């Protein structure tokens, strides 16, 4: 049962939208659209729709910053349910590629984020275990995963009193991808101490599962906090999932290896016939090494390129994705596409770019043709999935409107009574100086300023200029990673600085109630960043503050500017009439500032600055120990054993307190 927790109740305008959407979905309509202005509470409407339908829901967004914001909000709305997070686990990713013109092969290079990997595994585990699941996902949801039925077939179910020999259990754990590690015990590891076996599930954060045996009988089972050295909840039954969604059973693995060998022989015969000896040797060496690894360990580097064989699919079949984990046992589920006017075009372009790069790798003997089936969903496959869709946007594109037909629900009024912002036109000749004067007035009121420019270089130069004039300012563009972006947005809201300069990262979905001034530089430069949709979305960032105002710097009024101003002014009239009817006085949005995603690093800073450990709360000490443990493992991997030993001693000090 999905249970919504909130101190607020839907406004009349929200109630009407919720009622219409729920009725449309229950009637069986596949597509519907929520057209809601910025600040009208679309997220709260989405949460109420989910509660009323009470079915598993996938919420998709086009960027990681919005995913993080949605995850935080829905964790609050559905605190008693399973709210999961599924985005790419790469902090850095360079896919393998080959450039024939220069004969340059670029090896795959990546850096994975352990916490994001854990959250992905937690998402699939929850989908296979529970019905009350809300999952926030990025475009990663469209990329291939393992067969959910194979994944379920690999699970290990523990029940008190069950009989299993230690030898058999350890073999099963290894088959599931878990590694024995009696010294540096970490996620996806297990350790053995006599009749006690500790398992650290790959999708757990701080706790392990401790199994106590009497001979071959499972005598006791409970959660155990390794960092605090404390026993947790007793368990009567526990389901352990594999360490990877690509895990497969022994029978399937043997068949996959057989199929890969057959495809390899066929491809080698082709290269030999075409007298492509370099490609022949390259492919033979590479695939035979991968086969050896698969045979001995069940995994290999780049295992996803053999996904078609491992999942048992045929050439050209739709790959398994997160959607198939939702659809397990043919259950109904809802897909909400947030900021659909941006998300859907992004989904549409994914397949072509991926295919082009991989085709070159196949043609030149770096990969087997089956690697082409390790791909994202084609747009038609995505949009025709066996589920129902709700598109959400302040500016839906023609595609959403066409698909939804008459099932379009408007949400123009804000529960807070806030109006769309006032718009002022300013001469772009003196835009930097004019903005400085306007920004000072806003900052004196303890409010914030957003500035959007057209290039990274201009963002950086403008930041330097305003810093010299004494404004606390930062810039944000695509070179800044997801976690740092989150920190910058948090810093703006908390008052660490007063002005944020960006390009197109300041548009969709960012909820910044402290911002009362939006400055759009060079607003008359026609293009993607100054289209009608982009202008309306950017202006919307000022619609959460009662003093909201937008400055458009220009020399002329373009068609896009005029359309954006007309739409905004028309909405202001409707909103003013609504406020008068219901006697509403506009008030700025009040929104909690989320905790930093860098809490663990901050604790490390506190420790390094000499905060007394004995004065730290136990929960902080546990988090600090966790951070130090990561550093210890990294030092050990880098063969810096003295450093690792020193960190180990510090961890022991923490545990002794």
UniProtKB/Swiss-Prot annotation:
Q: Name one Pfam family in it.
A: UvrB_inter
Its chief place of residence is cytoplasm
Task: Provide the Helicase ATP-binding domain boundaries.
Answer: 23-414
Q: Where is this motif: Beta-hairpin?
A: 89-112
Keywords in UniProt for this one? ATP-binding, Cytoplasm, DNA damage, DNA excision, DNA repair, Excision nuclease, Nucleotide-binding, SOS response
Annotated function: The UvrABC repair system catalyzes the recognition and processing of DNA lesions. A damage recognition complex composed of 2 UvrA and 2 UvrB subunits scans DNA for abnormalities. Upon binding of the UvrA(2)B(2) complex to a putative damaged site, the DNA wraps around one UvrB monomer. DNA wrap is dependent on ATP binding by UvrB and probably causes local melting of the DNA helix, facilitating insertion of UvrB beta-hairpin between the DNA strands. Then UvrB probes one DNA strand for the presence of a lesion.
Describe its partners and assembly state. Forms a heterotetramer with UvrA during the search for lesions. Interacts with UvrC in an incision complex.
NCBIfam families (alphabetical)? PRK05298.1 (NF003673), uvrb (TIGR00631)
What's the record's remark on domains?
The beta-hairpin motif is involved in DNA binding.
Q: What is this protein called?
A: UvrABC system protein B
Q: Write down the species.
A: Campylobacter jejuni (strain RM1221)
């Amino acid at each position: 049962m999905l249970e919504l927790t909130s101190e607020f109740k839907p406004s009349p305008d929200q109630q009407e939208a919720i009622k219409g959407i729920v009725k449309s979905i229950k009637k069986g309509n596949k597509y519907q659209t929520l057209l809601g202005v910025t600040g009208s509470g679309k997220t709260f409407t989405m949460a109420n729709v989910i509660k009323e339908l009470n079915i598993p829901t996938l919420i998709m967004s086009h960027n990681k910053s919005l995913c993080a914001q949605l995850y935080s909000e829905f964790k609050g709305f559905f605190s008693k349910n399973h709210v999961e997070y599924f985005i790419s686990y790469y902090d850095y990713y360079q896919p393998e590629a080959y450039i024939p013109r220069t004969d340059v092969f670029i090896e795959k290079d990546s850096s994975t984020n352990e916490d994001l990997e854990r959250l992905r595994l937690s998402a699939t585990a929850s989908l296979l275990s529970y019905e009350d699941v809300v999952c926030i996902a990025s475009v990663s949801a469209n990329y291939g995963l393992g067969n959910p039925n194979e994944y379920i077939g690999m699970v290990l179910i523990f029940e008190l009193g069950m009989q299993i020999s230690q030898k058999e259990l350890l073999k099963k754990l290894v088959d599931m991808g878990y590694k024995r590690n009696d010294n540096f015990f970490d996620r996806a590891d297990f350790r053995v101490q006599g009749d006690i076996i500790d398992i650290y599930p790959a999708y757990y954060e701080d706790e392990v599962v401790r199994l106590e045996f009497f001979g071959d009988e499972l005598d006791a089972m409970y959660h155990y906090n390794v960092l605090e050295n404390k026993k947790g909840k007793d368990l009567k039954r526990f389901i352990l999932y594999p360490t990877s969604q690509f895990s497969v059973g022994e029978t399937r693995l043997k068949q996959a290896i057989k199929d890969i060998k057959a495809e390899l022989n066929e491809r080698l015969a082709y290269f030999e016939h075409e007298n492509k000896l370099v490609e022949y040797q390259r492919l033979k060496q590479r695939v035979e090494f991968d086969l050896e690894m698969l045979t001995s360990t069940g995994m290999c580097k780049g295992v996803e390129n053999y996904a078609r064989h491992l999942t048992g699919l045929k050439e050209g079949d739709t790959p398994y994705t997160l959607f198939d984990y939702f659809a397990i046992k043919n259950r109904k589920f809802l897909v909400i596409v947030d900021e659909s006017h941006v998300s859907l075009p992004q989904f549409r372009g994914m397949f072509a770019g991926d295919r082009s790069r991989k085709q070159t790798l196949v043609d030149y003997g770096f990969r087997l043709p089956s690697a082409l089936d390790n791909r994202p969903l084609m747009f038609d496959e995505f949009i025709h999935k066996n589920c129902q869709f709700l598109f959400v946007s302040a500016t839906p594109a023609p595609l959403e409107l066409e698909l939804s037909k008459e099932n379009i629900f408007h949400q123009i009024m804000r529960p807070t009574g806030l109006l769309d912002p006032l718009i002022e036109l300013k001469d772009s000749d003196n835009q930097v100086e004019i903005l400085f004067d306007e920004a000072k007035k806003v900052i004196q009121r303890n409010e914030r300023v957003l500035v959007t420019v057209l290039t990274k270089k201009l963002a950086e130069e403008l930041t330097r200029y305003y810093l010299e004039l004494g404004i606390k300012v930062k810039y944000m563009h695509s070179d800044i990673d997801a976690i740092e972006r989150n920190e910058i947005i948090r810093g703006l809201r908390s008052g660490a600085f007063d002005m944020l300069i960006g390009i197109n990262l300041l548009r969709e979905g960012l909820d910044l109630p402290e911002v009362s001034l939006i400055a759009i530089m060079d607003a008359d430069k026609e293009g993607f960043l100054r289209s009608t949709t982009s202008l309306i979305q950017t202006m919307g960032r000022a619609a959460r503050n009662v003093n909201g105002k937008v400055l458009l710097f220009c020399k002329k009024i373009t068609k896009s500017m005029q359309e954006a101003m007309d739409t905004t002014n028309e909405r202001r009239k409707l909103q003013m009439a609504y406020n008068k009817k219901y006697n509403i006085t506009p008030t700025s949005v009040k929104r909690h500032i989320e905790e930093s995603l860098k809490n663990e690093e901050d604790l490390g800073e506190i420790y390094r600055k000499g905060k007394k450990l004995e004065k730290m709360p136990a929960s902080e000490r546990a988090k600090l120990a966790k951070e130090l443990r990561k550093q210890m493992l990294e030092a050990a991997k880098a063969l810096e054993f003295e450093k690792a030993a020193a960190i180990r001693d510090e961890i022991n000090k923490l545990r002794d307190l």
